[in-house]
Amino acid sequence: MDAPQTPQITQKISAKSLDWRRLNIRMAATQTPPPRSYIVGHLPERRGIYGMLIGPDGSRKSWLALHIAVAVASGRQVAGGLWPAPARGRVVFFTGEDVAQEMWHRIHAVAQNEDDASWLADCDENLDIIPLADGNDGLTLICPSDEKAGFAQHPNVAALIEYCKGARLIIIDPLADMVDASENDDVAARLLVQTLRSISRETGAGVLVSHHQNKAAMGSGDKSNQTARGSSKVPAGARWSVTLQPLSDKEAKDREIFDPEFWTKIHEGKASYSARTNSNDLALYHYPETTDAHGKTVGGVPLVRMLPVKEGGDDAPKPRTGRKRTSTNGAATRPNRGLGNVMGAGADEFDARFADMPLPNIPTTQEDGDDCPF
């Protein structure tokens, strides 16, 4: 991943049998360091690093993990513009919940929503998806042990490191399925943090894990990094984390969203090596499966989209999510879909491709009595 450590920036010190190195303070103070780089979003391109996707059940964590895998394998934007993946490279995606048949559906859905076929050649070469729930040998990172600590790295870790050497990114979804220990055990959590960092160091890859959110945060809407279920040591050890949450009833009402079940809010809960670029309006919108003019099925897939902002005042335009938006001259226009909703090359072509396709089956009459033209 990153270049070998510059010898001068650290100096070996004598600490009996421990391999410790002291930072060269003079060099650090007087010489400009190389610029930071990222694998995807703000996940640092550094050995010994892991990040987290945190969210409740059904918050599309696995979908986002797949989008990230495709983006890094092909050097593309995540989900049509969520974050960049500046350089392509090999991705190994271990999925513990979704069988091969389901992953087939999802990859096919992603393919139908891509305008540029070049991604397929890249992913065919760079993306390994391993559906562990489909009868493969499982993957366990830590397990009970007779040793004093009570836990040890599972032999699977050595096999994972051997297989993933040279990869750019390793995704583990979900983390809880790969740990044979209580999530609340701090001793097991400390070993898990060390194991994830070790996997990154030994393979040269960044590591990204998905993990469930705790019940208190699901009820309160807390989006912080520490809302991950179980011991706080695991999210504390991550250098980047993203929280996914469904819309609350109040948020949907305040924003005049009539199809909240299609939306997932995206929040950057932690970015240790960068300023966080959070927006309260950033989300994934899950477009349902539809059929094009030729009778071809276009799979449902979540893509990046901005949540509508309800503007104050009786004369202010009031966008109706998924159905109607208002242009600068007050004329009603069809909302952009997917890639064209936010940014990215090919946005116009994407919107043109879907211009005549049906929208989600949601209310077609506005609260003020105006008929929706769609």
Predicted feature locations:
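Hydrophobic alpha-helical membrane-association signature
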Residues: 68, 156, 188-192
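A structural alpha-helix within SAM-dependent methyltransferase catalytic domains
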Residues: 66, 70, 161-165, 197
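C-terminal regions of RecA-like/P-loop NTPase motor modules
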Residues: 4-6, 10-16, 164-166, 202, ...
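Conserved ATPase "switch" residues in P-loop NTPase domains
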Residues: 73, 77, 164, 200-201
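Conserved inter-motif catalytic segment of the P-loop NTP-binding fold
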Residues: 18-20, 86-183, 374
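Phosphate-binding/switch region of NTP-binding enzymes
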Residues: 52-53, 58, 62-63, 169, ...
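The Walker A/P-loop phosphate-binding site
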Residues: 7-112
